[in-house]
């Protein structure tokens, strides 16, 4: 199964593509969709949708796993929610099934406990995908963690 993991944001959307065929998981691609901070929010959302469409066409994921956030007092909340909406809409247009996971569930799936530190989750990602170097940037590593959670929780 090919899974696209997504860590949404307006400035950067982390993505990671894994393949789980053959009895083990392997990373096919990871990176970020970076938007231009000098552009309007609407233009940045168009950038996210356009780049995500290209990823979907290139990798043909059978499942998308998206990190789900719960913000209460963050000034960044609206931007993340808007970017997440663009991600969800684009996935729906391509009929890619979506599963969503909050950060604690991702940490639990990979590190064994929901309050794991970022470096513990990163170590688990590297181990599960048999990587010798940590995926960079951090948003891409986070997206790979989301993709792996999608596989483990299917």
UniProtKB/Swiss-Prot annotation:
The EC number(s) this enzyme carries: 3.1.21.10
Catalyzed reactions: Endonucleolytic cleavage at a junction such as a reciprocal single-stranded crossover between two homologous DNA duplexes (Holliday junction)
Pfam families the UniProt entry points to: RuvC (PF02075)
ATP-binding found in the keyword field: no
Gene3D superfamilies: Ribonuclease H-like superfamily/Ribonuclease H
Keywords: Cytoplasm, DNA damage, DNA recombination, DNA repair, DNA-binding, Endonuclease, Hydrolase, Magnesium, Metal-binding, Nuclease
Active site (UniProt): 7, 67, 139
Binding sites annotated in the UniProt record for Mg(2+) 2: 67
Residues that hold Mg(2+) 1 according to the record: 7, 139
Family of the protein in this entry: Belongs to the RuvC family.
NCBIfam families reported for this sequence: PRK00039.2-1
Protein name: Crossover junction endodeoxyribonuclease RuvC
Species of the source: Parasynechococcus marenigrum (strain WH8102)
Taxonomic lineage from the root: Bacteria, Bacillati, Cyanobacteriota, Cyanophyceae, Synechococcales
